[in-house]
């Protein structure tokens, strides 16, 4: 299987399955002498890990990361950084009834058609469990970006039809929904409770922002910065759409409204472009929005076929998120960090 490595200079290769022994990653191209310890990475993993609230999956994985190479006396050495996380709360028996069935809306069917074999336990390699290593790698990328004054944060901006206004950035990590609005918590709780009672799931929108960037990151034509961001975000499980800046709202805007005018004293007067023009950063905040589909693992029966092509019905057991977009926030942050640190290193190589 190819397609397990991301990046050009700062590269991340992941391996592991949902119910396998471990998850692992190799991060290559990291500059030397970056202060790094397991606690730095664990802070980010703890934001993503399952089983932290009644609003996400009840699979309880500690996601304790171990650095096995590339760090000496608390600093990166410039050699490949090896990371490993042991899976500890697998319940593979929950999936025994679907080992010969394809769950509708999942990658079961396509993996089987491509490889002629699949790990049916929790989706195997196609499971969002894989994203734990992305978040771990993203934690390292964030440390590098911080050195250059670049900060990344994300938040859940919509759950189902419930749009959530951005009020307080500091509140994002103080609630289980990663929302920036304290007043919206009760509505989010009621919505998720209602969805769970129905044995169903719901989609979500996640917004991710990068601040403190200089102008000039990114390359034309096929390596545009916004193209790289979209590529990274679309690689996240359950993401079905990505927009930059005003995104699809630009369809109804006029040019006189959408163009981001500039003055000598005030700089850019707006940021409809989301911090990117011509595939290159403007120095403004980079803003991306991701649409997460509702998970297909629900308690309601659905029509499908088995490996012999016979009609069947599937009811998914196991422990699943009623809204996968909630835990998608730290994953989106990690992928944006990986894109930006790679582009930063590429830009430095051009200038050097």
From Swiss-Prot:
GO annotation, biological process: amino acid biosynthetic process; aromatic amino acid family biosynthetic process; chorismate biosynthetic process
Pathway: Metabolic intermediate biosynthesis; chorismate biosynthesis; chorismate from D-erythrose 4-phosphate and phosphoenolpyruvate: step 7/7
A GO term from the CC aspect: cytosol
EC number: 4.2.3.5
Entry keyword set: Amino-acid biosynthesis, Aromatic amino acid biosynthesis, FAD, Flavoprotein, FMN, Lyase, NADP
Known catalytic reactions: 5-O-(1-carboxyvinyl)-3-phosphoshikimate = chorismate + phosphate
Note accompanying the cofactor annotation: Reduced FMN (FMNH(2)).
Keyword Coiled coil: no
Family affiliation: Belongs to the chorismate synthase family.
NCBIfam families assigned: aroC, PRK05382.1
Reported function: This reaction introduces a second double bond into the aromatic ring system.
Name recorded for this polypeptide: Chorismate synthase
Gene behind this protein: aroC
């Amino acid at each position: 299987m190819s397609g397990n490595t991301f990046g050009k200079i700062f590269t991340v290769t992941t391996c592991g399955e949902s119910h396998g022994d471990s998850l692992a990653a190799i991060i290559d191209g990291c500059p030397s002498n970056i202060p790094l310890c397991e606690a730095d990475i664990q802070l980010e993993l703890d934001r993503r890990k399952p089983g932290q609230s009644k609003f996400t999956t009840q699979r309880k994985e500690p996601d304790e990361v171990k650095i096995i190479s590339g760090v000496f006396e608390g600093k990166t050495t410039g050699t490949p950084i090896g990371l490993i996380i042991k899976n500890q709360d697998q319940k593979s028996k929950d999936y025994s009834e679907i080992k010969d069935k394809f769950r509708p809306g999942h990658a079961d069917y396509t993996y089987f058609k491509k490889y002629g074999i699949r790990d049916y336990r929790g989706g195997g390699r196609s499971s969002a469990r894989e994203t734990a290593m992305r978040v771990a790698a993203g934690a390292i990328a964030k440390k590098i970006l911080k050195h250059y004054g670049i900060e990344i944060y994300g938040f859940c901006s919509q759950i189902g039809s419930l749009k959530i206004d951005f009020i307080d950035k500091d509140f994002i990590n103080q609630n289980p929904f990663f929302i920036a609005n304290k007043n919206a918590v009760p509505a989010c709780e009621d919505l998720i409770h209602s969805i769970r009672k129905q044995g169903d799931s719901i989609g979500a929108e996640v917004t991710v922002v990068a601040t403190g960037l200089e102008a000039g990151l990114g390359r034309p034509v096929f390596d545009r910065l916004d193209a790289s961001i979209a590529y990274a975000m679309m690689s996240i499980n359950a993401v079905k759409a990505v927009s930059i800046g005003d995104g699809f709202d630009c369809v109804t805007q006029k040019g006189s409204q959408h163009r981001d005018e500039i003055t000598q004293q005030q700089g850019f007067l707006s940021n409809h472009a989301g911090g990117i023009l011509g595939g290159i950063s403007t120095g403004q905040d980079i803003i991306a929005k991701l649409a997460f589909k509702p998970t297909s693992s629900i308690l309601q029966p659905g029509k499908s076929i088995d490996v012999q092509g016979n009609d069947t019905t599937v009811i998914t057991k196991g422990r699943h998120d009623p809204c996968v977009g909630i835990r998608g926030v730290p994953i989106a942050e990690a992928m944006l960090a990986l894109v930006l640190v790679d582009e930063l290193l590429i830009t430095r190589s051009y200038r050097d």
